């Protein structure tokens, strides 16, 4: 149960992230049924006298571009999955199709220059007047974050949970103290802490306190008691750590951590980010299957079609199997031994997701 006061307090906190003048145009991409869009995409604009344009249908990149070209917004709120698709099909596809450019982009200085130019094209994609790209609803792939930084696109990562109305942490625009890879610091009037942190990594459950924290779960006192601990601190169910400056780093969901027989904790989201960075991977999910780590991969059919057009089914499958084996080898080289993938399976359809494009992991757990 979220009160009027909870939502208003959170909208006030969000207003400290960027100065919004009356008449500023927002484009709403996420559904209003989600607390992030309701607070940051509706209440915040109303609080500041802004105008909101709604997509009104499934927000594919083509539809987002169309409405942005028409409305020319200064603020766009998106889910990471949409950004990943734009990045793969409008940025990385150019490197794959131009071998010379792909070769030279292995050099950091040239890659930064390429990304800067790609950033200018993405500014046009969003209508040419973008002042803020607000990213929330799920974790952002680190590779996408590096691109946004090198492309000089104005973006803010937000972190929150519905029980907190939902915003808990974000990186105020222009704050040099925001650490790359983090979701920024606690927003105004919110306190964060890590419960029972690991002595070596500092990772533990993220807990929050503030005027935005829920009243409880409707007609469920037991669940409320489990979620709200002493002095109104909320157990978020997310794992993370805080650095000395107060930057919050998200590691994954408490209930999605894979504990191997060796006692090692595996955070599947971190591995999935690496898999999803592959151009032929649309999305992926890592799970445990009889003591080993298994990756389910839903391939990008358009990408594969462009490279196997005219091939018969067996040859197409052989090509995909080779890609998957190379991907497993490459990803495993960047992972600790305990986190390496033992098997990769092709998943035949998109994974079932929430309204904010988070995979419903519980449907695929064995």
Per-region residue spans from a language model:
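Conserved C-terminal "lid"/linker of ANL adenylate-forming enzymes
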Residues: 258, 283, 291-294, 326-366
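Active-site glycine-centered loops adjacent to acidic/histidine catalytic or metal-binding residues
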Residues: 137, 160, 184, 238, ...
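C-terminal boundary motif of the adenylate-forming
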Residues: 239, 278-302
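Conserved AMP-binding/adenylation subdomain of ANL enzymes
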Residues: 8-25, 32-121, 129
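Conserved ATP-binding/catalytic segment of the ANL
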Residues: 200-260, 265
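Adenylate-forming
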Residues: 213, 247-276, 303-318, 336-341
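Gly/Ser/Thr-rich phosphate-binding loop
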Residues: 74-77, 87-177, 282
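Conserved ATP-binding loop and adjacent catalytic segment of the adenylate-forming AMP-binding
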Residues: 52-55, 124, 128-129, 142-191, ...
């Amino acid at each position: 149960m979220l009160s009027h006061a909870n939502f208003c307090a959170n909208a006030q906190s969000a207003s400290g992230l960027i100065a919004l003048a009356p008449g500023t145009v927002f484009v709403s991409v996420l559904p209003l049924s989600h607390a992030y869009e309701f607070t940051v995409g509706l209440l915040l604009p109303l609080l500041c006298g802004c105008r909101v344009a709604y997509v009104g249908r499934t927000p594919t990149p083509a539809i987002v571009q169309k409405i942005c070209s028409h409305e020319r917004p200064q603020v766009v709120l998106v889910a990471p999955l949409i950004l990943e698709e734009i990045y793969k099909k409008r940025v990385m596809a150019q490197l794959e199709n131009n071998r010379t450019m792909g070769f030279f982009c292995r050099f950091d200085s040239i890659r930064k220059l390429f990304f800067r130019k790609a950033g200018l094209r993405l500014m046009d994609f969003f209508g040419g007047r973008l002042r803020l790209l607000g990213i929330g609803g799920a974790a952002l792939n680190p590779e996408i974050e590096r691109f946004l930084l090198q492309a000089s696109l104005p973006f803010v990562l937000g972190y929150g949970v519905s029980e907190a109305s939902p915003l808990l942490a974000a990186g105020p625009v222009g704050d040099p103290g925001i650490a790359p890879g983090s979701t920024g610091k606690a927003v105004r009037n919110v306190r964060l802490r890590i419960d029972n942190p690991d002595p070596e990594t500092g990772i533990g459950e993220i807990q929050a306190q503030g005027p935005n924290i829920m009243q409880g779960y409707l007609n469920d006192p037991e669940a409320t008691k489990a979620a709200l601990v002493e002095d109104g601190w909320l157990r978020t169910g997310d794992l993370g750590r805080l650095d000395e400056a107060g930057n919050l780093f998200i590691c994954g969901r408490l209930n999605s951590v894979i504990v191997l027989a060796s006692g090692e904790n595996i955070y599947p989201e971190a591995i999935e980010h690496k898999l999803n960075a592959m151009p032929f991977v649309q999305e992926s999910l890592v799970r445990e299957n009889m003591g080993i780590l298994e990756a389910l991969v839903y391939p990008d059919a358009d990408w594969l079609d462009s490279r196997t057009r005219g091939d018969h089914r067996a040859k197409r499958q052989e090509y995909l199997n080779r890609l998957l084996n190379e991907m497993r080898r490459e990803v495993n080289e960047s992972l600790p031994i305990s986190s390496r993938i033992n098997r990769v399976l092709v998943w035949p359809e998109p994974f079932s997701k929430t309204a904010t494009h988070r995979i419903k992991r519980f449907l695929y757990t064995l």
